[in-house]
Structure formats: C-alpha cells, structure tokens
Amino acid sequence: MAQHGPVLGIDFGTSNSAAGYLRDGKPHLIQMAPGQMTLPTTFFFDFETRQTLIGEPANQALLDGTEGRFMRALKRVLGTSLMHEKRQILNERVTFVDIIARFLREIKIRAEAETGLTFDRALSGRPVVFHGTGDRREAQAEADLRACYIAAGFKEVDFLFEPEAAAIASGTLDQSGEIGLIVDIGGGTSDFSLFRSGNDGVSILANHGVRIGGTDFDRSINIDRVMPLLGKGSTLRKAIGPGTTPAPNAIFNDLATWEKIPFLYTAQTRRMVEEMAQLSETPEKMNRLVTVLQDELGHDLAFAVERGKIAANNGANCPHIALDQIERTLTVVLPAEELAPILAVHAQALAGGATETLQLAGVTAKQVDRVIYVGGASPMVLLPHPMETLVPQSPPSFPQVFNPLNGGLALPPHPALRRTETPPPHLP
C-alpha cells in the first residue's frame, strides 16, 4: 500500500465489526454508536419504509417484528457463487457485494464523521482461511472482500491476517524471545498465529485457521435441541403406498445456519413443508416448522439459541432457550453441563488447528510461553479449550476480545511485524 493519507483499520467480522486508526502514534478505536466500539454485522431491509438498517437498528427491527428481511453472517458467503448472484431486495436487484459494500461504507462514513479525516485507504483483517486450507474458494473470497471495499469507496485496500493483528496489538510478552500463541475464535472462523516477541517487535512463526466459530456453536445447539421440536428426526408417511420415510435433514440444517436462513423463505420451500406436515406422524412438530417459514422466524430462533448459549456460558440460573415466538410456553432447558458434548466436535477441530500451527513452525507445545485468546467466541468457557490440554504450562490471557485485533489493524504492520519463513534452529 502506498504510504500516503490516513489508513482505516477495519475488522469486518461475521457477527460484529470494528474500526480504528493511528492517532498520535497510538491506535484509536472509532465509536460506532454512543458508548459502542463495535457494530453488529447485520442488515434489515424494511419492506414498509423501503430503508436498509444496519447494526443495532437492524437487530431491533427483527425483535420488534417489523416486516422485512434480516441478514447476518454474510462474511461466510465470501468466495461462493452466491456473492455475485443478483436478487430482488426492496426496489432493486443487488448482489451480496453490494450489500456488504453498504456496510463497509457506513463504517467509513462514521469514521470520517468522528475524525474529520478522509479515509481512502483501508487495512482489513481477514481470516487465515475463509473456507479451508487448499480450498479453491480461498483466493476468490479475498477478491470478493476487496471488491466490497472498492465498492464502498476505498481506493486502496490491503489485508492482514486477523491473528497477526492481535499479535501486534498484544506487543511483547514478559521477556524478549518468548513465544505466544494467538487463538482467535471468531463468529465464523478460528485462527491461530504463533509469534515470538522481541525488543524490535513481533515475528510471526506460523499461521493456520479452521472454518469454525461462534455461529457453528449456535448451529450445533440449534440442531441438537431446537430442530427436533420442529420435526427433525421424525418420520413421514409415503404419499403413495404403505411405509414411512425420514423427514429430510437439509431444511433443518439450513434453518439452523445463520447465513442460509433467508434463502428458505420461498414459495417452493413453504409448499414442500406444508406437504411434509400433512404426511407427518407428528404433525404438531412439523406444523411448528410451517409457522417458522410462514412468519419468517428463522433468525428469531437463531437469536434465541444464541441468548440461551450465552446464559448457560455465564452461569445463569436455569438457562434455557425461549421459543415463545412459535408457541407461548415452548422452552428448551439448556443445562451448562450438556453443552460440552454438543460442542465436542468443534473442540476437537480447534485442537487440530492449534497442533497444526505448532507443526508448521517446528515448535513443540512445551516451548509455548503463553496462550492469548481473542475473538468474540473466545469467552465460551463451556467450550473445552483444547489448548489447556495441549499447552497446560502456558498461562492463558483474555484481553478485551475486539480491541487487540483492531488495535493491531490500526498500527502500521512494518517494521513491527515480520514473518519467519523457516523457524530458527534453536527456539527458546
């Protein structure tokens, strides 16, 4: 990136976003709303006013039952064919590039209004992997994100791996030469950076990532606890002849997936579910699914699951998932001790990601001096943190989950950041 004009560091997240810039040599976070340094990465297209709402107003419109279309977790669509498909929303046909660009433009506008500066240059965080190591969609995902920034009004955009930004912001460890492992568990991906601190900055030894985040935790809880109440796992009578067949899992899996929910609200899907309800051996359950699609309650359910997850994680008394949007007294009890088995598969994947990071650097677990957790999903104490087993000797650190990442994006990456292609032969 050419060195001219101020740079706006942007953490465009799956669930929440933030921005910052360098002021008087120190990172300064932009206030997205009074007292709020983050902006929910959500959209609501109001059918009555024909307006597009972003952030908390979008969330509130959904909670208020305003007629419209809600969207969240669009970062997970980057790199897929859906990004460039035009669809009718309000009075125009738009792509997801257009929609994400509007969100980034709003961040740009708020930053310029607060600072009085013009930001033509952006340094954007990006996950180490969008979809998976070696996935053919990786290059396209970054190209899509770049296109969104350009469409938002930025003239130049560079990218920095999100865990590297957190490593920069974390600065040096207790002693020069110590090794730290950044574990960035975000809404849609989890990234790992192994770095070594020194008097002259931070050296990145290895980066790795897996496509697992907080929205996947929500999805697993939703599928395990909520979808059975809507007919998942039930049987349908065959339309012709005797016998039964299982209800198809695909619709329940999509309904539990944040970024796929809007695509279920079609006449074809509604007709299919109505036919399933007529053939169901448990029609009271399948009729709930009919209601969810007719009244477009998919995101309401997803938020209810998220609230229940947070309550269980925070040690609330009798945590539960309230489903009164469907039926007034419908509730799912969510005991904290039952979350670990539901999330076990994700814990295993995180352990694999951390192990692979160490192997890429040629570093053993015993050489790691500290594990630093960042990212919005990192405070999930009920998720069995595999690093506690992998590196039990390393004290964990939980700085504010967003500030380290965006602070690193606001700081200049050179000369503090260096990537070490081949680890030195004698690591401390």
Locate each region found by the language model.
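Phosphate-binding glycine-rich/basic clefts of nucleotide- and phosphate-handling proteins
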Residues: T38, S197-L323
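Core structural elements
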Residues: G187-S190, Y265-E275, V374-P379
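Flexible hinge/switch segments at interdomain interfaces of large molecular machines
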Residues: K75-S81, G116-F119, E274-E281, N313-L334
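Amphipathic beta-strand/beta-sheet edge segments enriched in Tyr/Trp
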Residues: S190-S197
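N-terminal phosphate-binding loop and flanking beta/alpha elements of the actin-like ATPase fold
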Residues: M1-L39, A58-I182, G198-G214, L330-T364, ...
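Intrinsically disordered or highly flexible coil/loop and linker segments, enriched in small
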Residues: M83-H84, G116-L117, G231, T235, ...
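A polyampholytic, Gly/Pro-enriched intrinsically disordered region
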Residues: S176-I185, K232, H414-P428
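Short, well-ordered loop/turn and helix-capping segments at boundaries between secondary-structure elements
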Residues: I223, M227-K232, T389, Q393, ...
